[in-house]
Design a protein with these regions (language model features):
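Helix N-terminus capping/helix-initiation residues
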Residues: 113, 145, 194-195, 215, ...
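Short, charged N-terminal helix-start/capping segments
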Residues: 4, 32-35, 115-128, 216-233, ...
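Long, contiguous, compositionally biased segments that the model treats as domain-scale units
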Residues: 1-209, 412
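A generic structural signal for short, non-catalytic loop/turn and secondary-structure boundary residues
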Residues: 135, 153, 179-181, 228-230, ...
Length: 442
């Protein structure tokens, strides 16, 4: 079967039916669009408005559309031959098989291919070219050995391994276009034959874990599934909400990432395990960090400020009676080795609270206490940094390790002016939060 990518568009033309009435076959076209979603346009209509499963044989493949609902209203006048087209929206498409229900679906394993994460994983089968003549470099030897699977995570229900694959050009060597594509993928094995799409939470948790580590937007290229007692792979198409960090690295380099796999390989299972537990416990705060805001500066600030509160509440269950300012000040003091570069803890927490109160409820009495422009930009990014350090702490890094991580990240080293204390005081510096200095709009 051909490969189906989540970031491409597809159309499947054929006949469609429901499990409750398999004899009613309606012609139509199923459209998958990476941006707009899944739409089934039928030359007729099924009875009902919601459908757990819709079957199709289209464009030469068997297809199952999952979690569907009709967006059309059709008046059934009982007139034979009446033309009554309808449109149905779906949540997921399984390409390659027909199933009666998700509960009956037993997957042996799932293979998740992400966007390029090799600079993070350092997992490759290529060796560096060896030149016969180092001066002329006219002849070289290049060797390749498929690397062994790296254990990423394991528990009672699943095993997750990180693998490497090489797409070898079929035209080699009789072509000018010699494109070797090596990619990393995660194999998620269903150890207990759990029914349904058991892998969904891990797919999302993995891409967010690596996005945090790399400070970049990691996406899913494809998801293929091996069904029990079903030889070929099948593919799933779904519109995953894209990760879009407000503050991200310019490129995938060791100096722009928080950490690489090689730096934490001995403890990667522990780190991901803690991350997955928190992912399941506090999805709201995680989503506020990873998903795109509207683009206004106060939106950048407010989403991170709200995530900060929710994450702190989940991590510290005994603090339900704490006020917002107390949470921010406690986090500032917890990571004071880093946050000291931004100013005073009490001043910072007070300013964050005033801005949170105003932008979340538009309190008129707080209008004269809020900022915009450059000052709000500093405040938004400082809150974002505090949230990132809290997430790094959640997955297992202590305060000393986090200080080193931030200091080794060139973007934050420059932003926080770490090491710049030896520069002349007359040089332009970043804004520092201080209770003695009133905030001015800039």
């Amino acid at each position: 079967m051909k490969k189906y990518n989540l970031n491409e568009n597809y159309e499947f033309v054929g006949l469609w039916s429901t499990p409750t009435d398999p004899e009613q076959l309606i012609p139509g076209v199923l459209k998958y669009n990476a941006e707009t979603g899944i739409n089934l346009e039928l030359e007729g209509s099924f009875s009902g408005e919601e459908f757990n499963i819709i079957h199709g044989h289209a464009s030469g493949v068997n297809i199952t559309v999952v979690d569907c609902f009709s967006t059309s209203w059709t008046m059934n006048l009982g007139i034979e031959g009446m033309y009554a087209p309808s449109k149905i929206v779906g949540n997921k498409i399984i390409v390659g098989t027909v199933i009666e229900s998700l509960d009956e679906l037993i997957l042996e394993h799932v293979v998740l291919e992400t966007s390029d994460i090799k600079p993070w994983s350092k997992l490759s089968g290529f060796s560096k070219p060896l030149y016969d003549d180092i001066n002329e470099r006219r002849k070289f030897s290049l060797t390749y050995k498929l690397p062994d699977e790296k254990i990423f995570y394991s528990d009672e229900e699943v095993d997750i391994g990180l693998n490497c694959s090489l797409n070898f050009p079929s035209t080699f060597p009789l072509s000018e276009d010699l494109v070797f594509r090596e990619s990393n993928s995660f194999k998620i094995t269903n150890k207990v034959s759990k029914g349904g799409l058991f892998h969904s939470a891990h797919v999302d948790a993995i891409r967010k874990f690596i996005s945090l580590a790399t400070r970049t937007d990691v996406s899913c290229r494809s998801i293929k599934m091996k069904l029990k007692d079903h030889e070929p792979y099948v593919f799933i198409l779904a519109n995953l909400i894209p990760i879009n960090l407000d503050y991200k690295a310019k490129k995938l380099s060791d100096y722009d990432m928080f950490f690489t796999l090689t730096e934490v390989e001995e403890r990667i299972q522990e780190l991901y395990s803690k991350w997955f537990i928190f992912y399941c416990k506090s999805p709201e705060s995680i989503n506020l960090y990873f998903y795109k805001t509207k683009g206004w500066q106060h939106d950048f600030f407010l989403t991170k400020a709200q995530a900060l509160e929710e994450a702190h509440r989940q991590i510290n269950p005994g603090t339900n009676k704490w006020g917002y300012q107390s949470r921010v000040e406690a986090l500032f003091n917890k990571f004071c080795n880093v946050m000291a570069h931004t100013g005073d803890a009490q001043a910072f927490s007070n300013i964050v609270k005033d801005h949170r109160d105003y932008y979340s409820h538009w309190f008129e009495k707080k209008r004269n206490k809020v900022s915009n422009g450059l000052i709000l930009g500093y405040l938004s990014r400082d809150v974002n940094l505090l949230l990132e350090m809290m997430l790094l702490n959640v997955i297992g890094f202590d305060e000393t390790e986090i200080l080193k991580i931030v200091e080794n990240c060139m973007a934050y080293r420059s932003y926080l002016e770490i090491g710049r204390e030896h520069y002349p005081s007359s040089s332009e510096r970043r804004h520092l939060w201080a209770s003695t200095s009133p905030i001015e709009n800039m």
